[in-house]
Regions:
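Noncatalytic, solvent-exposed loop/strand surfaces
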Residues: 1-244
């Protein structure tokens, strides 16, 4: 992740969102990830999840909270959590005194740090852009788990398994969180530190919801795939006779 001065283009800082021992391998077999999601700025902090091509399937992912006000003192402007100081005979890293990391969520699960989703990793590869309001953050991983965290500390409030992959991002509006999945189900959660599923909207034609919903003028809009349709939901409205 790079931050530049908007007027001069000067590099302000850079932050490595992969562990130093992560490696790229074809077909998703590696541990290094890419950016598929969009960074979100909230309260002078940057939030970003990492993942891979969804065709690479699930795997270890990470979610970072970065201090965007950090003043980098190093010549290379590196504000990553650690710095590599040797590669031979083995990789050696040390804490970076310039680190802009506020908190990190993810990585492999361990006995001391068991996964809240019962997976072998704490947070999976993600294509999801975070949604944040009232210091409450929502993010999803490719494998279909929705996570709700404290945006300031990274502490977990709750998770929910949608039992289907999701390419979608949570959309927060009117104190509700909307997100779709590959089973064609649009989930509606209450914006809350407590898990409360307000509803599930089903499509029984084998379609997928991969785009992120959007709301305007009291209506919710979202796309489905295979077949491609645009759906519009309005409070109190009745579905058309043909379902379109």
């Amino acid at each position: 992740m790079y931050a530049f001065h908007p007027d001069s283009g000067e590099l302000l800082w850079k932050f490595d969102c992969n562990p130093k021992n992560a490696v790229y391998k074809l077909g998703g077999r590696g541990t290094a990830n890419d950016f598929v999601a969009t960074p979100v700025i909230y309260d002078d902090k940057l939030y970003i999840s990492v993942g891979q091509d969804p065709e690479h399937d699930t795997g270890v992912g990470h979610l970072y909270c970065i201090d965007i006000t950090k003043q980098a003192t190093r010549e290379d402007k590196d504000v990553s959590p650690t710095l590599v100081v040797a590669t031979e005979p083995e990789l050696k890293e040390e804490p970076n005194p310039d680190s802009a990391l506020i908190w990190h969520y993810g990585g492999p699960a361990t006995a001391d740090n068991p996964s809240p989703t019962q997976e072998t990793y704490y947070f999976g590869r993600s294509m999801s852009t975070c949604a944040i309001q009232d210091d409450i953050l929502y993010v999803a991983e490719l494998g279909g788990h929705v996570h709700c965290l404290d945006a300031q500390t990274g502490d977990l409030y709750w998770t929910e398994n949608m039992f289907s992959n999701t390419w979608s991002s949570p959309y927060l509006v009117d104190n509700k969180v909307f997100i779709g999945n590959d089973d064609g189900i649009l989930y509606v959660f209450e914006h809350s530190k407590e898990l409360n599923i307000l509803g599930e909207i089903y499509h029984d034609d084998g379609t997928k919801i991969r785009a992120t919903p959007v709301a305007a003028n009291g209506r919710l809009y979202y796309l489905t795939e295979s077949p491609t349709k645009l759906w519009v939901i309005e409070d109190g409205a009745q579905a058309a006779a043909d379902g379109n």
